[in-house]
Amino acid sequence: MSPYFLNSKILSQQLSSQTTKDKLPEKYGPFYFDQPVDHFSSDTTTFKHRYWANTDAYTAGGPVILYNAGEVAADERSFYVINSSMAELARELNGIVIVMEHRFYGESMPALNYSAKSLATLNTKQALADIASFITDLKLPNLDIELPSAPETKYIVYGGSYSGNLAAWMRQKYPQIVFAAIPSSAPVQMSYNFYQYFDPIRRYGPDHCIQAIHSVITYVDHILFSSLQHPISALKNKFGAADLEHNDDFAERKLNQ
């Protein structure tokens, strides 16, 4: 597990706790941008693309630090506009920090159903075009002066994990409008069944911990790969997952907890 993931997980938990006590001031959003549903067709239909922006530190010539929240509802990360390394960087550079939601997450829904036709626009190509469109056409409602367009305004795209992939790919695909990218733990080379991700844990973790993990995996696999429904159901019940019919869904839920 990467240090970035651990740090961002801790920060997300802290900010989630913070949001239960505090409310992000309305001057930071959320705001909504009219985004094309399909950037690569003649259809002009748009959806409301949600984002937050902190312009407090901005002075003329400052950059925009743009973070696409990736595969979560972005309100979970809205506090990043005031409390994050991005916010610190924006203050240091007299810039703006923006958190934007990924299409099909949170309130940024190009469609109200999950049909195959609707989900055809849920892909990386469209997500990158969303960011490019956002950079090109953005008008910030909480900024009193006009923000010069890119490349006059330097856009720094930020992210970690999948969001980091987007940052790196934006710099590669749209260099004319993206000045720089700061991707962390970004596996930009796609790999099917990327078991190597877990290999450093096996190789460098404490022996007793690795043995315990191996024993648990072996035990659970023995149950899930059997044809005996009773022990499978008992295992799911123990983890509060009795509602999950498919074993791969059960494994995915436990992996992400």
Language-model features: where?
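Glycine-rich "HGGG/HGxG" loop immediately N-terminal to the catalytic nucleophile
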Residues: 104-117, 136, 192
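Alpha/beta-hydrolase
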Residues: 169-257
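Structural recognition of the beta-strand scaffold that forms the well-ordered cores
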Residues: 65-67, 96-100, 156-158, 180-183
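Short beta-to-alpha linker loops that shape the active-site pocket of alpha/beta-hydrolase fold enzymes
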Residues: 71, 101-105, 187
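Alpha/beta-hydrolase active-site loop
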Residues: 118-146
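Alpha/beta-hydrolase fold nucleophile elbow
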Residues: 144-162
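Catalytic-loop region of hydrolases
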Residues: 1-96, 107, 114, 121
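Gly/Ala-rich beta-loop-alpha elbow adjacent to hydrolase catalytic centers
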Residues: 159-163, 167, 171
